[in-house]
Amino acid sequence: MPKMKTNKSAQKRFKKTGSGRFKCKQSHLRHILTKKSTKRKRHLRAASMIHDNDVAMVRRMLPYA
């Protein structure tokens, strides 16, 4: 049986935590930042966890994570 392929775009976006959950960086922090408040940008810097409904999809894309 051949090896399963890792989805490279998912590999760059998601990291598996020690407890088995997946974390990712929040969006809306790349450009058009002048109109966003400092508080909003500060809160967007924090990593967020993948929602439970999406975990199966991420696991399928990252078989060796």
Curated annotation (Swiss-Prot):
Pfam families: Ribosomal_L35p. SUPFAM superfamilies: L35p-like. Residues 1-26 are annotated as: Disordered. InterPro entries: Ribosomal_bL35, Ribosomal_bL35-like, Ribosomal_bL35_CS, Ribosomal_bL35_sf. Keywords: Ribonucleoprotein, Ribosomal protein. GO terms for cellular component: cytosolic large ribosomal subunit. Residues 10-26 have a biased composition (Basic residues). One of its GO terms (molecular function) is structural constituent of ribosome. One of its GO terms (biological process) is translation. PANTHER family: 54S RIBOSOMAL PROTEIN BL35M (PTHR33343), LARGE RIBOSOMAL SUBUNIT PROTEIN BL35M (PTHR33343:SF1). Belongs to the bacterial ribosomal protein bL35 family. HAMAP family: Ribosomal_bL35 (MF_00514). This is Large ribosomal subunit protein bL35. It comes from Hydrogenovibrio crunogenus (strain DSM 25203 / XCL-2).
